[in-house]
Every structure is written in C-alpha cells, then in structure tokens.
C-alpha cells in the first residue's frame, strides 16, 4: 500500500499539474502556501536585468512581441548567470505602463485587464508561491479566452521593488503605480521596510511620467497617514483632490478587486485611499 502524500508533496504535485498546457481550471490558493510577508532586505536570489533596455518581456507578454528585426544584444537577466554571455532581447510593440507593487494574489491585475485592454499591466510580487499562483491564474484565463485574446495584457514578475525598480523601468515609463494594502510594519524599527519612504518615493518619481498617478490604499490609519505625509513632503508629487479621486474608475476597482480589499469588506473595516500626481519636472 502506497504511503499517503504529505501536504508539501500534494502542493508540489498540484503545481506541477497546473503547468500542463491544457489546464482550464483556476488554481486554488491552498496549494500555494506562503508566509504573509517577506523581508525585502534578505537575499532572495532574484533575477533582474542590469538595465531596463536589457529586460526581455517576451515571455510575459507573448501576444505583444514585435516582429523579428535586428535585435540588440543584452547581458543575461541574472545575478548568477555568466554576465559575459550575450543574449537576444525580444522587443514588445509597446511598453509596460502600469505596475501593481506587491500584487498579492492578482485580484487587481485581473480586474484591470478588461478595463485597460490596450495597456500592459505588470504585477510585482516578492513571494515565490504567490507569484506562481498569479502566473498560473493568468495562464488559465488566457487559455479560457483564446478567441478574444483577453488577459494577454497582464502579467506578473517576482521582484523586490525596494531594491530593483529602476532595473525594470526607464525614466517616465509608467503612467500608474498601485500600492494596495502594503505590509504596515507596525514596529518603529520595521518602518524602514515600508514600501513608501522618502527614498522609494524618489524612485517612483523617476519611473512615473509627469501627470501619472500613484494610487495607495490601506485599512491601517497609521500607515495611511505615513504614506500621505511622505508623498506630500516629496517635491515631485501632489495629492489628488477627493472629487477627482472618486471620479477615477481605478479607485473603485482598487477598493473592491483585491483579495485584501474583499477581506476588509467582509470584516466591515475601513479603507483609506490617497492618490498622488507626478508633477512636471522643474525647468532649470
């Protein structure tokens, strides 16, 4: 009699089965077990390009790969591979314009896909299993919608935004950044791990084009105040007024589409929203 599989083996078998090309059922979260948070200062052995121009987006957005021409050579996107070995970078017909930082299980990505059908949206998530869940979720949605080509415009990437955001995006490339229900890091000694800070806001200002918007939402009043304080203190951002904020369709999606947002709703909690517009670059 065969021994019963333990939970870890069941998870591994399930995820291996999800890699088959004919799977049409949505992945189940219980097979993608992961800690709630990850330390952004740890060495996660992440893969990242040395420069945005050397990022190969073709595997993430295969429907948007440009026709083959003379493609520039690039170094491999890895900290462990031989950086002297050149590789070909397949260009896309358009750039990624929207980033969901800490995308979790991908609720916002999936909701934005039909609302922004002509825009490439990327989820950035540091946790391995959660990233795999979102990847499998998008693959299934693409298979289910082969005729309409829906969900080809969204993808997910395992990345540490606190360290490597400028490695993926050129100056002014993004029109929107979403920061939804980030880890509040309640202890004062952990505040340096918060995804909004003076230093990180400068990186957001670099990646977001003038007129672009950073969207924030949390159910923690203290963290909301922290994010507002740090963005309002930054010379390249201004807070968007309440009337304009509530008229933005992305705000309603952000409130209700994320898994954390739904959890807060079930618990009858309060959601705090703030938007910040990227100002024009100063003229010297």
Swiss-Prot record:
Its EC number is 2.1.1.33. Keywords: Methyltransferase, Nucleus, RNA-binding, S-adenosyl-L-methionine, Transferase, tRNA processing, tRNA-binding. Its main location: nucleus. The active site is at residue 183. InterPro entries: SAM-dependent_MTases_sf (IPR029063), Trm8_euk (IPR025763), tRNA_(Gua-N-7)_MeTrfase_Trmb (IPR003358). GO terms for cellular component: nucleus; tRNA methyltransferase complex. GO terms for molecular function: tRNA (guanine(46)-N7)-methyltransferase activity; tRNA binding. S-adenosyl-L-methionine binds at residues 102, 125-126, 160-161, 180, 258-260. Pathway: tRNA modification; N(7)-methylguanine-tRNA biosynthesis. It catalyses: guanosine(46) in tRNA + S-adenosyl-L-methionine = N(7)-methylguanosine(46) in tRNA + S-adenosyl-L-homocysteine. It is found in: Nucleus. It comes from the Eukaryota. PROSITE patterns: SAM_MT_TRMB. Catalyzes the formation of N(7)-methylguanine at position 46 (m7G46) in tRNA. NCBIfam families: tRNA (guanosine(46)-N7)-methyltransferase TrmB (TIGR00091). Forms a complex with TRM82. Belongs to the class I-like SAM-binding methyltransferase superfamily. TrmB family. This is tRNA (guanine-N(7)-)-methyltransferase. It comes from Podospora anserina (strain S / ATCC MYA-4624 / DSM 980 / FGSC 10383). The gene is TRM8.
């Amino acid at each position: 009699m065969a021994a019963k599989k333990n939970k870890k083996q069941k998870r591994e078998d399930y995820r291996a089965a999800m890699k088959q090309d004919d799977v049409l059922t949505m992945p189940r979260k219980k097979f993608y077990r992961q800690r709630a948070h990850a330390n952004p200062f740890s060495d996660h052995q992440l893969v990242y390009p040395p420069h945005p121009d050397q990022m190969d987006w073709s595997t993430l957005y295969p429907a948007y790969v440009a026709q083959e021409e003379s493609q520039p050579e690039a170094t491999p996107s890895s900290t462990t591979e031989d950086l002297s070995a050149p590789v070909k970078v397949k260009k896309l017909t358009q750039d990624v314009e929207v980033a969901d930082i800490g995308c979790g299980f991908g609720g916002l990505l999936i909701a934005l896909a039909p609302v922004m059908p002509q825009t490439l949206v990327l989820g950035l998530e540091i946790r391995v299993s959660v990233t795999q869940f979102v990847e499998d979720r998008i693959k299934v949605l693409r298979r289910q919608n082969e005729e309409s080509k829906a969900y080809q415009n969204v993808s997910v990437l395992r990345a540490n935004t606190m360290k490597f955001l400028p490695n993926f995006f050129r100056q002014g490339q993004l029109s929107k950044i979403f920061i939804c229900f980030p880890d509040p890091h309640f202890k004062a000694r952990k505040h340096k791990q918060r995804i909004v800070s003076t230093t990180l806001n400068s990186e957001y200002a670099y990646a977001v084009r003038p007129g672009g918007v950073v969207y924030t939402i949390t159910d923690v009043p203290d963290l909301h105040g922290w994010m507002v304080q740090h963005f309002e203190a930054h010379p390249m951002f201004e807070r968007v007024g309440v009337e304009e904020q509530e008229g933005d369709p992305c705000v309603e999606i952000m409130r209700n589409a994320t898994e954390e947002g739904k959890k807060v709703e079930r618990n009858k909690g309060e959601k705090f929203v703030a938007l910040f517009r990227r100002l024009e670059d100063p003229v010297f």
